Structure formats: C-alpha cells, structure tokens
C-alpha cells in the first residue's frame, strides 16, 4: 500500500457536527488522528483526505475559534465562515488555522471535490474549480520541500498543471467505465 485515500468519513458527517463539508476528525472512527497519521508515516504510506469545502467552516468545528478570530468574526456569534476562493484573507487563514496543522500532523495532500458552484461569488467568471486547484497547489509549492500534489477535478484549460484529475462521481456500469479514459 503506497497511498491511503480516506473519503468523507474522516470527519463528522451527521447534522450538527458536520455534513458534506467537515473539518473535525470523526473521533468515533479515528479516536487518535495523530496516532493514525503517525502509524501511516512509520509505514511509508502517504495519505490524502477528501474535502468538500463549499459550506465553509461552521461554529461546531474544532478550529473555528482561531479562524473566526483571524477573519474578524466574533467566535461567540457562531457565524459560519463562508468559503470564498477569491478571498485571499480567508484562504490564507484557512491554511494557517485548519489545513496546515493537519498537514503537519501527517496529511500529505488533499483530495478536493468541489462541485457546488461554477463561479466565485465575488470575482466574475472566476472558475471555483480552477482557482481552488491553483490556490492549494501554490500553497504547497510555497510552503513545502516536496513537489506539490493535489487530487481534484479538472478546472479548464491550463488547469492540468495543478492537479491529478479524476472524473468525479460516476455511474457503476461498463458503459461508464468505457467512457472514463476520456477524462
């Protein structure tokens, strides 16, 4: 085994603790996340976690207080911090408070699964998929000693340089499998 790919269940998915988007380890399935990641590292296994970031960061997430503070939001307000790809302050603080600490614990790369909106709400015609690939890849390029790696959907022309693409969710059938090479 070279790479362990963990889908959504690494984080809580039940209402009030998580959902499609989640940033807090599911302690029912992973009671000791650092130990789990450490074990994989000791056995030379790379790990990627699945992210569906579109719902932002809710107040029940473990890392919410630090992110809210850095975003100028009173943590007591319990206001969800929206995910806006074009918001440089948000992306910077998201990496600082949530993603980079998980990378330091042992996450090697991310499996992004953005599919909740074609365009950024603040920058006209900015493809969310294209830009999130760029943002994650650039952060890894800037802050790591290893070659950047990202698993995600193709965001359009030129985006191939940032991610290892996948076709997204697929129907389980021979016809669907026959079509996959075109991705």
Descriptions of predicted regions:
Residues 1-183:
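Catalytic-domain carbohydrate-binding cleft regions of carbohydrate-active enzymes
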């Amino acid at each position: 085994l070279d790479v362990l790919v963990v889908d959504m269940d690494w984080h809580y998915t039940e209402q009030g603790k998580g959902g499609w988007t989640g940033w807090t380890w599911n302690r029912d399935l992973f009671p000791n996340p650092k130990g789990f990641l450490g074990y994989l590292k000791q056995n030379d296994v790379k790990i990627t976690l699945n992210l569906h970031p579109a719902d932002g960061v809710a107040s029940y997430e473990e890392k919410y207080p630090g992110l809210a503070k850095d975003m100028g939001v009173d943590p007591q307000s319990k206001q969800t911090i929206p995910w806006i790809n074009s918001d440089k302050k948000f992306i910077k603080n998201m990496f600082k408070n949530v993603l980079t600490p998980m990378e330091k614990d042992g996450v090697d790369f991310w499996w992004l699964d953005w599919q909740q909106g074609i365009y950024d709400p603040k920058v006209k015609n900015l493809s969310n998929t294209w830009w999130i690939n760029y943002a994650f890849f650039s952060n890894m390029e800037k802050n790591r000693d290893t070659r950047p790696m990202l698993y995600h959907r193709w965001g359009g022309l030129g985006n191939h340089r940032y991610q290892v693409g996948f076709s997204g969710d697929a129907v389980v059938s021979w016809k669907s499998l026959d079509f996959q090479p075109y991705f």
